[in-house]
Amino acid sequence: MVDKIVILGAGVSGNGTAILAKKHGYDVFVSDKSPIAEVTKEHFNKLGIDWEENTHTLSKMQGAKYVMKSPGISSNIPLIDKLKSLRIPLVSEIEFTSKLTDAVLIGITGSNGKTTTAMLTHHILKTAGFDVGLVGNIGNSFAKDV
C-alpha cells in the first residue's frame, strides 16, 4: 500500500513538498482554503497530484501517514485539532524533506541577520568548492531543491 501525505497549503512550501513527495512514490493530496493558482493546478494535474481549493475536506485526509502544514497556516485552527485527534503526525516541510535527503543541513535562525548570514555562508561554501543550495525564505523551498 502506498503511503499518503496531505499537504495543507499550495504555496511555495506546499508546492515543493507535493512534487517531492510524488517523486518519492507518495499518494499526494493538497488542500488549500484559498484559491490555487492556475499554473499550480495544471502542474498538479500533470503529475497526478490530487488537490482541492477553497476548503479543507477532513474525510479526504483520513488515512494519511503525514500532514505537512505550510508555515502560513495557524496551528490553532479546528482542522489541526481534528487531525491531531486522529493521530495523524503533523510535519513541517523541513522535517518531511530532511527524511528524503542525505545532504548536510545548516539551519540559520534568529531575530536579525538571517538573510545576510545565510547568503554569506552560501558564498563561502560555494567559493570553497562545495555543492551547496540556498533555500527557505531565500531562493527555492527546501523540498523543491531536493
Where are these regions (language model features)?
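N-terminal leader/targeting and accessory segments in enzymes
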Residues: 1-92, 96
